[in-house]
């Protein structure tokens, strides 16, 4: 099959530092090539995926006609990351990575990131993100620190909750997150006792920090669509202390972490690592279906469905729509 991935934007595929969506599409392209398929990428000119033809497009938000002209005529199916304004000349699927606005509708060929994410938008179609395990290390000897890996400037990611948990546990917290902190947090956070702020990290520096961490703290207060940080931490041998929101119950099982919306309960988890084994956490990514090859195989099943019928579901299926009253930015409960 010839798959053309369309992902124009300000960041290349893969991104040098931050950019979960771009990194996932990088892993998907690699996996599709490994599985014997032909792949073309329409994306930022600095993009590169081994074995994939790049058709560069400099515009971050091009008109549909701009990228339509770049589609190879031999393409069987297009994989988009944004719903097109005008239908492209080939069968397509769209992966949506965020939460929709109340009442927002989506194209029938939309694929979400988890069962919970799909359900919040009136759909049953989803594929969990997968990563390339070879990019992550899992050290046998672990450091005495926890890691928070998220866009720390975003309230729903709850970095303050991570600080509370680690203070209760008496464990140092390393924060990997946004460099665009509000209120000059990037200046005063490193001065908080027991917290080290690394700003934006990627590649080997991030892998090194995760590979020796005790655990990953992920106390989000929203309906998390997926949470790449969770599988990155698990691949590195980190067990997970997180809230039970969004996709997290689909990813975190009792042998690799604990889910709770109470800081005191997560602090006990962070304080007592003996029940969790790094190799079990890493194997969970492989056995749980969270590798890039698992992801590619699931997407291939959807590609074949669209090629055969033109759509993911049945002709009379309702159009995916954000549930009435669903507010992605409303903070979910958290008990200090």
Where are the regions a protein language model picked out?
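N-terminal strand-loop element at the rim of the active site
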Residues: 10-15, 27-62, 182
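Nucleotide-sugar-dependent
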Residues: 14, 153-157, 221-227, 249-250
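A charged, aromatic-enriched C-terminal amphipathic alpha-helix characteristic of glycosyltransferases
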Residues: 61-62, 272-329
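Conserved donor-binding/catalytic core segment of Leloir-type glycosyltransferases
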Residues: 124-129, 134-176, 288
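Nucleotide-activated donor-binding/catalytic signature segment of Leloir-type glycosyltransferases, i.e.
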Residues: 185-201
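Short alpha-helical segment that forms part of, or immediately flanks, the ligand-binding pocket
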Residues: 207, 230-235, 249-250
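Short hydrophobic beta-strand element within catalytic cores of glycosyltransferases
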Residues: 238-242
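Conserved acidic donor-binding segment of nucleotide-sugar-dependent glycosyltransferases
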Residues: 253-264, 270-275
């Amino acid at each position: 099959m010839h798959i053309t991935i369309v992902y124009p934007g300000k960041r290349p595929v893969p991104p040098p530092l931050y950019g979960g969506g771009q990194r996932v599409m990088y892993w998907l392209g690699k996996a599709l090539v490994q599985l014997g398929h032909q792949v073309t990428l329409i994306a930022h000119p600095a993009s590169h995926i081994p074995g994939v033809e790049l058709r560069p497009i400099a515009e971050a938000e091009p008109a549909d006609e701009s990228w339509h002209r770049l589609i190879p005529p031999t393409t069987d199916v297009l994989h988009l990351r944004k719903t097109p304004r005008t239908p492209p000349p080939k069968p397509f699927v769209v992966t949506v990575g965020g939460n929709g606005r109340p009442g927002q509708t989506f194209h029938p060929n939309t694929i979400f990131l988890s069962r919970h994410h799909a359900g919040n938008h009136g759909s049953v179609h989803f594929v969990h993100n997968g990563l390339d395990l070879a990019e992550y290390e899992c050290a046998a000897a672990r450091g005495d620190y926890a890691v928070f890996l998220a866009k720390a400037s975003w309230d729903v990611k709850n970095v303050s909750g991570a600080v509370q948990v680690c203070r209760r546990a008496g464990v140092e917290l390393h924060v990997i997150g946004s460099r665009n902190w509000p209120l000059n947090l990037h200046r005063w956070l490193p001065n908080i006792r027991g917290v080290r702020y690394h700003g934006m990290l990627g590649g080997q520096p991030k892998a090194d920090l995760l590979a020796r961490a005790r655990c990953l703290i992920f106390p989000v207060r929203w309906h998390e669509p997926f949470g790449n940080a969770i599988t990155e931490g698990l691949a590195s041998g980190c067990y997970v202390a997180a809230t039970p929101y969004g996709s997290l119950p689909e990813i975190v099982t009792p042998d690799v972490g604990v889910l709770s919306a109470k800081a005191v309960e997560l602090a006990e988890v962070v304080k007592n690592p003996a029940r969790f084994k790094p190799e079990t956490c890493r194997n969970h990514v492989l056995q749980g279906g969270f590798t890039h090859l698992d992801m590619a195989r699931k997407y291939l099943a959807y590609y074949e469905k669209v090629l055969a019928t033109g759509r993911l579901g049945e002709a009379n299926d309702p159009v995916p729509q954000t549930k009435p009253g669903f507010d992605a930015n409303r903070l979910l409960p958290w008990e200090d």
